[in-house]
């Protein structure tokens, strides 16, 4: 049996992929429902991908770190994968790809239906409090219960989106198995200001130039 910890986008995709090989798959989600954070992505529309996705579009010390992922499962693969699940998509002028319905709920629905169709057991309100390796595989502590699995896929997500379930609980589970964690930094964050004049701008996106070290 394969246990997937986390019922977000990565957890659902991992569970579906594992089930393609006729393995018994159980997905464990600590919240009352799966895909909750997905519902808030793209201002509620769920930005699935971007037709212009490429390593040079990323920023950081090693912009090539995404190359293996894009080579293994690129944008065309993403579009075709969701089409196979019954989800039609639309590409906007700026390259962003959304579900045709413009509703993030459509993405969650097709993933849930696909999981049910492939016999994946979805267990919600089920938090993994500890994870350890055994001679036969892995033991997952679920409060008063224990689950034994041959393989485990950890898809708990990070600290982002605390209001919709982000907790970073997966870090502790992985560190307990001997993995290390680099220092965490916030990425997309709010700017604090007086709400009096900006309340009406909620949900509005704008492309602005960024100046740093005299460079645009």
Task: State where each predicted segment sits.
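Receiver (REC) domain switch-region micro-motif
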Residues: 2-3, 152
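Glycine-rich FAD pyrophosphate-binding loop
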Residues: 3, 19-43
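N-terminal Rossmann-fold NAD(P) dinucleotide-binding loop
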Residues: 11
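Residue-level recognition of phosphate/Mg2+-coordinating polar/acidic sites
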Residues: 20-21, 31-33, 54, 77-80, ...
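Hydrophobic anchor at the start of a short beta-strand
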Residues: 23-26, 89, 152, 181
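Glycine-rich active-site loop/strand segments that organize a redox cofactor
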Residues: 43-91
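Short beta-strand to alpha-helix junction loop
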Residues: 66-74, 93-113, 160-166, 192-196
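Predominantly flavin-linked oxidoreductase catalytic cores and closely associated redox partners
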Residues: 110-216
């Amino acid at each position: 049996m394969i246990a997937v910890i986390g019922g977000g986008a990565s957890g659902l995709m991992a569970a579906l992929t594992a089930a393609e090989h006729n393995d018994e798959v159980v997905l464990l989600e600590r919240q009352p429902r799966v895909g909750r954070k997905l519902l808030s992505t793209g201002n509620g529309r769920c930005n699935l991908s971007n037709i212009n996705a490429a390593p040079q579009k990323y920023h950081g010390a090693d912009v090539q770190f995404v190359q293996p992922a894009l080579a293994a499962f690129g944008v065309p693969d993403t579009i075709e994968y969701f089409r196979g699940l019954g989800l039609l998509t639309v590409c906007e002028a700026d390259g962003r790809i959304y579900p045709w319905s413009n509703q993030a709920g459509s993405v969650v629905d097709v993933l849930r239906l696909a999981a049910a169709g492939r016999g994946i057991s979805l267990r919600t309100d089920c938090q993994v409090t500890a994870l350890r390796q055994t001679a036969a595989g892995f033991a997952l502590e679920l409060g008063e219960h224990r689950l034994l699995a041959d393989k485990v896929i950890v898809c708990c997500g990070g600290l982002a989106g605390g209001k919709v379930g982000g907790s970073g609980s997966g870090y502790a589970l992985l560190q307990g198995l001997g993995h290390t964690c680099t220092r965490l930094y916030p990425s997309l964050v709010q700017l604090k200001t007086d709400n009096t004049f900006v309340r009406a701008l909620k949900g509005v996106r704008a492309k602005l130039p960024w100046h740093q070290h005299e460079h645009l």
